[in-house]
Amino acid sequence: MEEKPKGALAVILVLTLTILVFWLGVYAVFFARG
């Protein structure tokens, strides 16, 4: 589990950014529809 902490951080960062972009897209569509 402690082999590559940087790799784990990178995975968490990518997941966070993906979720953030996903929710921004959902919110944009929801807002566009009124």
UniProtKB/Swiss-Prot annotation:
Residues recorded as bearing N-formylmethionine in the entry: 1
Main location (coarse class): membrane
Catalysed reactions listed for this entry: 4 Fe(II)-[cytochrome c] + O2 + 8 H(+)(in) = 4 Fe(III)-[cytochrome c] + 2 H2O + 4 H(+)(out)
E.C. number(s) listed in UniProt: 7.1.1.9
Keyword line: Cell membrane, Electron transport, Formylation, Hydrogen ion transport, Ion transport, Membrane, Respiratory chain, Translocase, Transmembrane, Transmembrane helix, Transport
GO CC annotations on file: plasma membrane
Transmembrane segments: 4-34
Record's protein name: Cytochrome c oxidase polypeptide 2A
